[in-house]
Swiss-Prot record:
InterPro entries referenced in this protein's UniProt entry, alphabetically: Alba-like_dom_sf (IPR036882), Pop7/Rpp20 (IPR014612)
GO CC annotation: cytoplasm; intracellular membrane-bounded organelle; multimeric ribonuclease P complex; nucleolar ribonuclease P complex; nucleolus; nucleoplasm; nucleus; ribonuclease MRP complex
One GO-annotated biological process of the protein: tRNA processing
Leader sequence segment: none
SUPFAM superfamilies: AlbA-like
Family listed: Belongs to the histone-like Alba family.
Stated name of the protein: Ribonuclease P protein subunit p20
Effect the entry attributes to changing residue 40 to Q: Strongly reduced interaction with RPP25
Cellular compartment(s): Nucleus, Nucleolus; Cytoplasm; Cytoplasmic granule
Keyword NAD among record annotations: no
Function field: Component of ribonuclease P, a ribonucleoprotein complex that generates mature tRNA molecules by cleaving their 5'-ends. Also a component of the MRP ribonuclease complex, which cleaves pre-rRNA sequences.
Pfam families, A to Z: Rpp20
Length: 140
């Protein structure tokens, strides 16, 4: 028999939007490192690309250059994360390589009742994620 992984008060069917308000929680993140870039769809593409390039180049003064960065994308931002990594690689004239890993992330949604007679509910859903390592290679 299939194991029920849903927490207490979990939702299995669609609920009436008049009865509940959907609140999507932020996904859990690992402790942030200086060379981690979390890509989203709200920030401008050129700004995210410039931030990645700045980390790889070491900023305006050339200090603290990272030999590798990790670009993380979740859901709709996967495409943008891939595009950023490919733009970095294309602009590096062969000095950068990329390695991608995919995963599935569990996200938790909270359903808050509109009336006091109902209990708050939670819903777990899965979303795809990508983690791209962009790193420098030594020329041969």
């Amino acid at each position: 028999m299939a194991e029920n992984r849903e927490p207490r008060g979990a939702v299995e069917a669609e609920l009436d939007p008049v009865e509940y308000t959907l609140r999507k929680r932020l996904p859990s993140r690992l402790p942030r490192r200086p060379n981690d870039i979390y890509v989203n769809m709200k920030t401008d593409f050129k700004a995210q690309l410039a931030r990645c390039q700045k980390l790889l180049d070491g900023g305006a003064r050339g200090q603290n250059a990272c030999s590798e960065i990790y670009i993380h994308g979740l859901g709709l931002a996967i495409n943008r994360a891939i595009n950023i990594a490919l733009q970095l690689q294309a602009g590096s004239f062969g000095s950068l390589q990329v390695a991608a890993n995919t995963s599935t992330v569990e996200l938790v949604d909270e359903l808050e009742p509109e009336t006091d007679t109902r209990e708050p509910l939670t819903r777990i859903r899965n979303n795809s994620a990508i983690h791209i390592r962009v790193f420098r290679v030594t020329p041969k």
